[in-house]
Swiss-Prot record:
Region (Homomultimerization): 18-28
Description of post-translational modifications: Asymmetrically arginine dimethylated at one site by host PRMT6. Methylation impairs the RNA-binding activity and export of viral RNA from the nucleus to the cytoplasm.
Organism: Human immunodeficiency virus type 1 group M subtype B (isolate LW123)
This protein's record includes keyword RNA-binding: yes
UniProt xrefs under InterPro entries: REV_protein
Ranges annotated as biased composition (Basic residues): 38-49
Protein name: Protein Rev
Note: HIV-1 lineages are divided in three main groups, M (for Major), O (for Outlier), and N (for New, or Non-M, Non-O). The vast majority of strains found worldwide belong to the group M. Group O seems to be endemic to and largely confined to Cameroon and neighboring countries in West Central Africa, where these viruses represent a small minority of HIV-1 strains. The group N is represented by a limited number of isolates from Cameroonian persons. The group M is further subdivided in 9 clades or subtypes (A to D, F to H, J and K).
Listed Gene3D superfamilies: 6.10.140.630
Biological role: Escorts unspliced or incompletely spliced viral pre-mRNAs (late transcripts) out of the nucleus of infected cells. These pre-mRNAs carry a recognition sequence called Rev responsive element (RRE) located in the env gene, that is not present in fully spliced viral mRNAs (early transcripts). This function is essential since most viral proteins are translated from unspliced or partially spliced pre-mRNAs which cannot exit the nucleus by the pathway used by fully processed cellular mRNAs. Rev itself is translated from a fully spliced mRNA that readily exits the nucleus.
Cellular component, GO annotation: host cell cytoplasm; host cell nucleolus
Family note: Belongs to the HIV-1 REV protein family.
Region (Disordered): 23-52, 92-118
Localization of this protein: Host nucleus, Host nucleolus; Host cytoplasm
Length: 118
């Protein structure tokens, strides 16, 4: 499903169903605008805290069922000085210059593999 390798579709669907149920079972609409300023502030604060709890539980469900974090792994990119554009094939006259798919050459492909799962 969606190009995920190694993850079972059933696990993904189960996680999505659980998270959907979690959000639907929270009969907690946004707070009403009535009342004093302090009362409104307290209602908003409590509502935001409940929403944060639901979000953190959803992240834990994802990490449990899919075996990975819900947050993306930071990608280590090489310095800009080491990147070059190879335009040997597609550079033509001024009318077609820049058309095509330039290749980006990187010295060490192992830099991009540092975020893989162990």
């Amino acid at each position: 499903m969606a190009g995920r390798s190694g993850d079972s579709d059933e696990d993904l669907l189960k996680a999505v169903r659980l998270i959907k149920f979690l959000y639907q079972s929270s009969s907690d609409p946004p707070p009403n605008p009535g009342g004093t300023r302090q009362a409104r502030r307290n209602r908003r604060r409590r509502w935001r805290e409940r929403q944060r709890q639901i979000h953190s539980i959803s992240e834990r469900i994802l990490s449990t069922y899919l075996g990975r974090s819900a947050k993306p792994v930071p990608l280590q990119l090489p310095p800009l000085e080491r990147l070059t554009l190879d335009c040997n094939e597609d550079c033509g006259t001024s009318g077609t210059q820049g058309v095509g798919s330039p290749q980006i050459l990187v010295e060490s492909p192992t830099v991009l593999e540092s975020g893989t799962k162990e």
